[in-house]
Amino acid sequence: MGKYFGTDGVRGVANSELTPELAFKLGRAGGYVLTKEAAQPKVLIGRDTRISGEMLEASLVAGLLSIGAEVMRLGVISTPGVAFLTKQLSATAGIMISASHNPVEDNGIKFFGSDGFKLLDSQEEEIEALIDGEDTMPRPIGGDVGQLNDYFEGSQKYMQFLKQTVEGGFEGIHVAIDCANGAASSLATHVLADLDADISSMGSSPNGTNINACCGSTHPEELAKLVVEKQADVGLAFDGDADRLIAVDEKGEIVDGDKIMYIIASYLKEQGRLNNNTIVTTVMSNLGFYKALEEKQIETKQTAVGDRYVMEEMRKGNYNLGGEQSGHIIFLDYNTTGDGLLTGVQLLNIMKQTGKPLSELAAGMKTFPQCLINVRVTDKDAVKNNALVQQEIKRVEEAMAGEGRILVRPSGTEPLVRVMVEAKTDELCQQYANQIVDVVKEQLGA
């Protein structure tokens, strides 16, 4: 990770860490790096529903126009919507303003190249060097200054694409949705209604400050209540920028990213559409996920946490399905990044084609008890070299005797250390996790 870029673009508290001044510099430097080879550079900008989005958008636009790029504002749209449209409209670059599942005070800026993929490390390093160096980038004058246009109909083009990934509609399927008061709020309702699903919704009234507030993919228990109350067939919970999905079955049980990937990989294999009989996932996936796929004779490739690393492995090995337990699912046949709405549509299609309820589709995977505790710390990277923390991890691993797993890592986007433990029982899981958390707090706690 660089000075400004984390694992998922530039993030921080809006107007404090991620300031309009920094956004302007990112617009200039990012725009220059991504458009310097283009004769007529065109950059798309989308945002989620955060109150700070328009402030940062204005600064980004100014920076981009100042280097001579044409800017097309997409308005409120999902992150995968920006990625799709960047490639579809042959734009030089795309930019999304969002902090995904983070609280409203945070925001972020992520870039996409003309191919719709996230940037290479080398491109991010070049942008950072330009921000910190003397600004010698072009400053065109007169008619060469960039022009701003709105392209709000881009959302319609993206929704049309989503609908075309399945044949027929979802008549008779009752879907409960939680849009996290974010970018999916209008998109999900329109797409599912056009596909003839019956819809019950929550988290679909964004006001600029309620994004991810006790709703969405990080709080699927709220959707689970709605599914049971409305007797829905399935629940779909998105995050603020709709690049991830957590589902709920008809009984109100949560179906996380691992189970969603298991269901989709199994279906694609049956259809002969799983490239190289392999799915790509991260070290956070549950032991039960790997065991279930072994039984299906599906191979797995494991990467570091972060959908960018999943994507890199997918492109390297020509795999078409990958994702994370958190609900980032990548269908490389359709889009260039994780897409919650696309995942939801594909999941509904599998239910329709197989005639099976979600609970039955997910039943083939038995989840090992897993605890994930986030610890706020002063220096998240110090955890790797702290002798006492590493000592405690080793002690717990010995106690597990091969019947469990530990993963302690710094967050890629927040000042947190994430402690993940899997064990045979819930009690052991909690006990082992707390032992490690206590030492992390003592050594590094904020």
From Swiss-Prot:
S-S pairs: none
GO cellular component, one term: cytosol
Post-translational modification: Activated by phosphorylation.
Catalytic activity: alpha-D-glucosamine 1-phosphate = D-glucosamine 6-phosphate
SUPFAM superfamilies for this protein: Phosphoglucomutase, C-terminal domain, Phosphoglucomutase, first 3 domains
Keyword Glycoprotein recorded: no
Bound cofactor: record note: Binds 1 Mg(2+) ion per subunit.
InterPro entries documented for this protein: A-D-PHexomutase_a/b/a-I (IPR005844), A-D-PHexomutase_a/b/a-I/II/III (IPR016055), A-D-PHexomutase_a/b/a-II (IPR005845), A-D-PHexomutase_a/b/a-III (IPR005846), A-D-PHexomutase_C (IPR005843), A-D-PHexomutase_C_sf (IPR036900), A-D-PHexomutase_CS (IPR016066), Alpha-D-phosphohexomutase_SF (IPR005841)
One Pfam family linked to the record: PGM_PMM_III
GO MF term set: magnesium ion binding; phosphoglucosamine mutase activity; phosphomannomutase activity
Enzyme class: isomerase
Active-site residues (renumbered): 100 (phosphoserine intermediate)
GO BP of this protein: carbohydrate metabolic process; peptidoglycan biosynthetic process; UDP-N-acetylglucosamine biosynthetic process
Entry keyword set: Isomerase, Magnesium, Metal-binding, Phosphoprotein
Reported cofactor(s): Mg(2+)
Modified residues (Phosphoserine): 100
UniProt-annotated binding residues for Mg(2+): 100, 239, 241, 243
E.C. code: 5.4.2.10
Role according to the record: Catalyzes the conversion of glucosamine-6-phosphate to glucosamine-1-phosphate.
Protein family membership: Belongs to the phosphohexose mutase family.
Protein name: Phosphoglucosamine mutase
